[in-house]
Amino acid sequence: MNFCAAIDAALPRAGIAIVAADGHAVCRHFVEGRPGLVETLPPLLQTCLAEAAVKVDAVAVTIGPGSFTGLRTAISLAQGYAAAAGISLFGVTVDEAFAMAFPTLHRPLWVAIRARKDRIFLIRDGIAEAFADADIPRTRSPVAVAGDAANEVAARLAAAGGDVILTNARMIDPVWVAHAALARHEAGLPPRDAQPVYVDPPEARLPAGGLRPEPV
C-alpha cells in the first residue's frame, strides 16, 4: 500500500486525509459541524484527491461509535469510492483511531464521546457502553482519557482518586484513521468490515405494515 485515503465523520468535526505509507499526510482537510455532511464530504474528498495528485491504494473510514448521520455518510462515501476505484476498504473504530495518536502510551486509553440524551459513550478495551455523567465507572488503575467528553470523565476519575491522564486529543484526526489501516495492512491482518458500530440501535423504524401497501 502506497497511499491511503481516510474519511472520518464520527464526531462533530469531520475530516479527510491522504496519507503515504510512511505515515506523512500529503493532504488533510477538516469541516466543523454535522449539518450538511452529505453535501460537503464528497467534494472535500475530490479536493483532497486533486491536491494530493497520487494513486490511492486503499480507503479507511471510521465506523463508530459516534454520530448516526456522520457514520452513515462517511461509510457510504468510502464504500462508493472504494468500489468505483477498485481499491481496498478498511473500517477503523473510534478507539483504534485515537490510539494512533499515542503510540508510546503505557496505560489503557479510555475514549469518551458525547452522546444523545445527555449521556457519554465510553470505550474501554474495545467495548463501548453508554453512561449518564453521574454513572461513569471509577477505576484506580492508571488510565488516559481522550475524546470530546474526556474533560468530564477525567475530572470524575480524578475526584474519585484515580490515576488519570487527560490527553489533548478531543477530535479525531483522519491521519490517525489512515495510520490504523496502514498498521493493520503491515501486520498482515485483513481489513475490518466497514459497517457501522452502534451503541444504541438506530431509531429509524419501518412502518408496521411495511413500506408498500398490500396489493388489492
Regions found by a protein language model. Give the residues of each.
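Short glycine/serine- and small hydrophobic-enriched flexible loop segments
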Residues: 46-47, 83, 179-183
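Oxyanion-binding and handling regions
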Residues: 1-25, 34-39, 90-216
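Generic structural marker for isolated residues within well-ordered, non-membrane alpha-helices
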Residues: 45, 78, 95, 99
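Phosphate/pyrophosphate-binding loops at sites that engage ATP/ADP/AMP, CoA/4′-phosphopantetheine
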Residues: 45-58, 136-140
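N-terminal phosphate-binding loop and adjacent alpha-helix
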Residues: 32-48
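DPxDG-like acidic metal-binding loop motif
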Residues: 58-89, 94
